[in-house]
């Protein structure tokens, strides 16, 4: 199951769509990343939506497979984490993958939909306020860590501690933050790419 999840995650949707349908190598354009945001920016809305959908479904499917097969000896959420590893370090693309946001969302959607929806609201609110995908992703990662530690104490969304769930959420979030180090530097310099949505409270001018 772990190998299947990893191979699912290794599917590089944006990279392959760019190569086979647009004759564009995403690694040579924009941020050079093969994930959803750069796909939207370089290849357009249609390619971006397809990439986002498939990257989410990779995580969801990897999480649901053990549930569908009735495997109870290992946590489906733990299995799903290997789809995130595959997305980030894909065997099909020289181990150079995306930033783990969409696939992490898919894993949460498959295992903890209420927690996923809560974080989605945080993501969309941050995006509306600041018009930055990267800042929204980083914010959700930080909020995710805090929430998985605090919510079980008060019984909000997460009713009790599950050490596997807590550990995997923290690992997912740290992966996202680490993969966004270049974005963090650009945000600090007020040079980060913006999306045409929201209030842009930082009043940064798009490049």
From Swiss-Prot:
Record's bilayer topology term: Multi-pass membrane protein
GO CC terms, sorted: plasma membrane
Keywords, in A-Z order: Cell membrane, Lipid biosynthesis, Lipid metabolism, Membrane, Phospholipid biosynthesis, Phospholipid metabolism, Transferase, Transmembrane, Transmembrane helix
Reaction(s) catalysed by this chain's protein: an acyl phosphate + sn-glycerol 3-phosphate = a 1-acyl-sn-glycero-3-phosphate + phosphate
Keyword Cell wall biogenesis/degradation included in the entry's annotation: no
Pathway the protein takes part in: Lipid metabolism; phospholipid metabolism
Gene Ontology terms for molecular function: acyl-phosphate glycerol-3-phosphate acyltransferase activity
Single GO biological process annotation from the record: phospholipid biosynthetic process
Segments passing through the bilayer: 1-21, 42-62, 65-85, 105-125, 138-158, 159-179
Pfam families in UniProt: G3P_acyltransf (PF02660)
Primary localization: membrane
Enzyme Commission number: 2.3.1.275
Signal peptide start-end: none
Cellular localisation: Cell membrane
Main function: Catalyzes the transfer of an acyl group from acyl-phosphate (acyl-PO(4)) to glycerol-3-phosphate (G3P) to form lysophosphatidic acid (LPA). This enzyme utilizes acyl-phosphate as fatty acyl donor, but not acyl-CoA or acyl-ACP.
Subunit annotation: Probably interacts with PlsX.
The family this protein is said to belong to: Belongs to the PlsY family.
Protein name: Glycerol-3-phosphate acyltransferase
Lineage: Bacteria, Bacillati, Bacillota, Bacilli, Lactobacillales
Gene giving rise to this polypeptide: plsY
